[in-house]
Amino acid sequence: MGTVSSRRSWWPLPLLLLLLLLLGPAGARAQEDEDGDYEELVLALRSEEDGLAEAPEHGTTATFHRCAKDPWRLPGTYVVVLKEETHLSQSERTARRLQAQAAHRGYLTKILHVFHGLLPGFLVKMSGDLLELALKLPHVDYIEEDSSVFAQSIPWNLERITPPRYRADEYQPPDGGSLVEVYLLDTSIQSDHREIEGRVMVTDFENVPEEDGTRFHRQASKCDSHGTHLAGVVSGRDAGVAKGASMRSLRVLNCQGKGTVSGTLIGLEFIRKSQLVRPVGPLVVLLPLAGGYSRVLNAACQRLARAGVVLVTAAGNFRDDACLYSPASAPEVITVGATNAQDQPVTLGTLGTNFGRCVDLFAPGEDIIGASSDCSTCFVSQSGTSQAAAHVAGIAAMMLSAEPELTLAELRQRLIHFSAKDVINEAWFPEDQRVLTPNLVAALPPSTHGAGWQLFCRTVWSAHSGPTRMATAVARCAPDEELLSCSSFSRSGKRRGERMEAQGGKLVCRAHNAFGGEGVYAIARCCLLPQANCSVHTAPPAEAGMGTRVHCHQQGHVLTGCSSHWEVEDLGTHKPPVLRPRGQPNQCVGHREASIHASCCRAPGLECKVKEHGIPAPQEQVTVACEEGWTLTGCSALPGTSHVLGAYAVDNTCVVRNRDVSTAGSTSEEAVAAVAICCRSRHLAQASQELQ
């Protein structure tokens, strides 16, 4: 599973020089022919190494990363990532310095690629013995061992993603995506297939590893199978989603559907350079592949996304947490799981679609009919999260064609908003993943008109914190989103609340674990609120009285969310963030030993109200939803006892979870209510009605 077909030993320099002398010119030429891909191996003198010497950077420690799945590792090839502001000349000089110092120690190295334009760094082939040396070089941020990535594939689908008003005898989308270009990083493609002929441009980019096995026979139909099928799903004449979109293909997977992290990185860099040289309209990049978690691949996706490119990727076919794989775990990427014709998670033998908090939504991914590379008119059925991602890439192309100025955050929010809700049987997922996995199946919006006038929000879960008392978890919104509220959740119920705090110029949601707890999640409510001015007001624990209170005191600001955290382990029957609209402006009220935080925002025409749903006796779950035209921005529990596991938003519904009431020993005095803050913009709603 390496990037070259065989492994080579690393010879000590004195022995290598002796062999070269013994072999003579003929032997040297033969060796040179055999090792043609080693033409840049460096034998440097000590004086050259000294000439490249630079003062080491103090106070910084570079780190080493490798794939957690051993069979996927590619030892001997490493991506050296340099600090963000490193110039190309410094990257090249750092690479030469590594070669010189390695040669002085008797090791041969080869610089395979120098990155620039997307991220600074270089790809090097070297012995693992040199890692300690490389980590100490100037400008080095971290080093990642290369690893493998894999294709993720094993006509109801078009009907499923089409809103009822558009359904007829055949699929006729409202916009074909003609203004959008889709880049596909996959295998090679049979570009003369009738489905995609004239719609796909095969670029000259190719970066793939050798196929495994000396007897592997490269049949064109197999080499082109995965890429041809996906190109047809995205923009095929008959079976495509975005029939008007144009495509460009880059080959990063070999005939066995295998590629490398480094090859994918170089492909993304190629796209960024093409974008700079030939600026066009909206770009969508489809990554129908998955490998182990990769910090460098996620970083490259982040850079490309912040340059205005929409990236869509497969969640993976391993029936596992998608956060353990890349690029599925990158927050800036739209990650897609797979469902079947009954809107249930796809099962692929003993495996199936990935799931979890890193998945944004699901899409059709079982028995998808598309172009076959067997002949220019053949069709074939394939399954997997690659096919699901291709559907979302097609939907994204049509949405961007209708609204070319959409940002990634706006596009993601629309994909979530217009998805089919609560149609997936969650029992298929592991119990600890059900609350984290979105119950959403992608669909086209019924109309783009008026969509921009809605208040869009989504729920973002953090990673699970550690079990120690001081452990915390942090949930973050995208750069273009506003954090309007913060909540927390613990399966054991042992937590110390949550708070909103500034970090790197942005508000984040931080949740606190408690002593004896098993860990906690932070849950952020992230919204698109143009021209918003938001802040957090905090009231420390009250010195006297029955509770702590805080409200929005700035003129024109409204309350969008409450949060609370405390240092004591057990507040007993306490009141964490609740709303008291009676007689006073909406305010957050909590236990006197807790700090209370109010999220207050001002935006054109923004108005918010409180909805509460209580029950006379405790239940395992209490919910309250916002009405049509209103959007849930805040979710909390009232009064909240030690039996409350937490509160979180699911679409437009506030959910409060309690411990199992049959074993928790609850009483009627500990009844729980779910409290929702529902907001809308009067200004935007009026503008929407005028358009309609």
Swiss-Prot record:
Activity regulation, free text: Its proteolytic activity is autoinhibited by the non-covalent binding of the propeptide to the catalytic domain. Inhibited by EGTA.
Q: Does the keyword Signal apply?
A: yes
One GO cellular component assignment for this chain's record is: extracellular space
Which positions bear Sulfotyrosine?
38
Stretch list, region C-terminal domain:
450-692
Q: Specify the Peptidase S8 domain's residue ranges.
A: 155-461
Sugar-bearing residue positions: 533
Keywords for this entry?
Answer: Apoptosis, Autocatalytic cleavage, Calcium, Cholesterol metabolism, Cytoplasm, Disulfide bond, Endoplasmic reticulum, Endosome, Glycoprotein, Golgi apparatus, Hydrolase, Lipid metabolism, Lysosome, Phosphoprotein, Protease, Secreted, Serine protease, Signal, Steroid metabolism, Sterol metabolism, Sulfation, Zymogen
What InterPro entries has UniProt attached to this entry? PCSK9_C1, PCSK9_C2, PCSK9_C3, PCSK9_ProteinaseK-like, Peptidase_S8/S53_dom, Peptidase_S8/S53_dom_sf, Peptidase_S8_subtilisin-like, Peptidase_S8_subtilisin-rel
As cofactor, the record names: Ca(2+)
Identify a single GO molecular function assigned to this protein.
very-low-density lipoprotein particle binding
Q: Name one Pfam family in it.
A: PCSK9_C2
CDD domains found in the cross-reference section:
PCSK9_C-CRD, Peptidases_S8_PCSK9_ProteinaseK_like
Indicate where the modification Phosphoserine is found in the sequence: 47, 688
Sequence ranges assigned to domain Inhibitor I9 in this UniProt record:
77-149
Annotated EC: 3.4.21.-
What residues make up the catalytic site? 186, 226, 386
Listed disulfide bonds for this chain? 223-255, 323-358, 457-527, 477-526, 486-509, 534-601, 552-600, 562-588, 608-679, 626-678, 635-654
Please state what the annotation says regarding this protein's domains: The C-terminal domain (CRD) is essential for the LDLR-binding and degrading activities.
Q: Which family does it belong to?
A: Belongs to the peptidase S8 family.
What this chain does, per the entry, is described as: Crucial player in the regulation of plasma cholesterol homeostasis. Binds to low-density lipid receptor family members: low density lipoprotein receptor (LDLR), very low density lipoprotein receptor (VLDLR), apolipoprotein E receptor (LRP1/APOER) and apolipoprotein receptor 2 (LRP8/APOER2), and promotes their degradation in intracellular acidic compartments. Acts via a non-proteolytic mechanism to enhance the degradation of the hepatic LDLR through a clathrin LDLRAP1/ARH-mediated pathway.
Subunit-level organization: Monomer. Can self-associate to form dimers and higher multimers which may have increased LDLR degrading activity. The precursor protein but not the mature protein may form multimers. Interacts with APOB, VLDLR, LRP8/APOER2 and BACE1. The full-length immature form (pro-PCSK9) interacts with SCNN1A, SCNN1B and SCNN1G. The pro-PCSK9 form (via C-terminal domain) interacts with LDLR. Interacts (via the C-terminal domain) with ANXA2 (via repeat Annexin 1); the interaction inhibits the degradation of LDLR.
List the protein's name.
Answer: Proprotein convertase subtilisin/kexin type 9
